[in-house]
Amino acid sequence: MTLPKKYQQAMQDLLGEEYSAYIESMQQRSQTAIRINTAKISLEQWAEICPFKTKPVPWTEKGFLTTDEQCNPAKHPYYYAGLYYIQEPSAMIPASILPVHEGDRILDVCAAPGGKATELAAKLRGTGQLVANDISVSRAMALAKNLQIAGAVNAVVTAEKPERLQESFSQYFDGILIDAPCSGEGMFRRDPHMVQDWEEKGPQYYAPIQRDILKAAYQMLREGGYLVYSTCTFSPEEDEKNILWFLRQFPDMHVCEVPRKEGFCSGITDAALTETERQQLSRCVRIFPHKTVGEGHFAVLLQKGDSSAVEQESNSVEQENSLAERVHDHGFRMAEKKHQSSGAGRRSKYDGTRQQRLSGKKDRRRMDGDNDLAVKATWWTGCLSAPGAERYRL
């Protein structure tokens, strides 16, 4: 694999004396790891039936590196049963550092193919509400399948731009995870094809997209709620500089301290910043392949406002502003807009149903924890307005 000269120079500037160690690590094999799905099996039960030779991933008790080169976790029946998810070790960090409590409302903004969403669902333990979104319909279909295999409940898959979600979920979520689209520098070793993508669309292409996602997420996060922003790139333009911009744009956001685990490096700071800004950015987490078992990664945990001064809102799905209600409203609005834009003069077929629902004459079909998976096209296709959304029926 040949790295672009521009990238090599950027990494030399970033790593200094450690650059040679980084280049050497790029010749080593990527690690295979699995994350146990505690929605289906406890860690104690897994220890009794584990068919692989493994060792722990440093930053999560649910993660294990497979040490037997002959084993293939993707071929084992336990994989198809949803007992574990095959995931790159560093990719386990974002969902592990997002505080999730039973009953919370959680949003995974860029969720496909589902590695982080399935972990968030497991942390909710069958309660609360999980919205797993991906702008790509085809990728969202894979996401829905993985959530189903994982046994996720109270989950809904959407295929919307974050700005569109913002219209229906203002200050709604207790926790939001953004595993942002990025230049993928941290994945060059695992997927050399990412190098070509980097040359075509580098940090300068992705940084504005990431900021738009951050802005939308801020509007959807409730006071006192938590936000995790992560990338699989080393570029400060997509990492610390984006967070610095975000903090300056929204002064009520602050970076939270994340317990330091083996392999965690602090975020990059600059002498030109204020002491407070340097302190905040240093709390970011960086992963480098020459220092630990995973690929390159960046993650940061932020909070909106002061949690000690914020009273936790009720997370009951029976309250008036439930997830089901908001998704229904969003779906009706999208259908009505489509109808109006078509120029048809007749009354929308949705109007009567909406009036019945609002008057209490029609079942609201709220999310129910007894459902195997609340990702059902008969309920949610209004929110999935992209072409092909009807294929989400499971």
Model segments located where?
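Polybasic, low-complexity RNA-engagement segments
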Residues: 1-49, 295-298, 305-394
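Conserved AdoMet
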Residues: 32-92
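A short acidic, Gly/Pro-enriched loop at the edge of an enzyme's catalytic core
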Residues: 101-102, 166-177
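Conserved class I S-adenosyl-L-methionine
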Residues: 103-112
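Conserved SAM-binding loop of SAM-dependent methyltransferases across substrates and taxa
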Residues: 113-126
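Helix-to-beta-strand junctions that scaffold the AdoMet/dcAdoMet cofactor pocket
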Residues: 125, 221-223
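S-adenosyl-L-methionine
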Residues: 135-170
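Mobile active-site "lid"/loop adjacent to the S-adenosyl-L-methionine
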Residues: 138, 174-216, 228, 232-240, ...
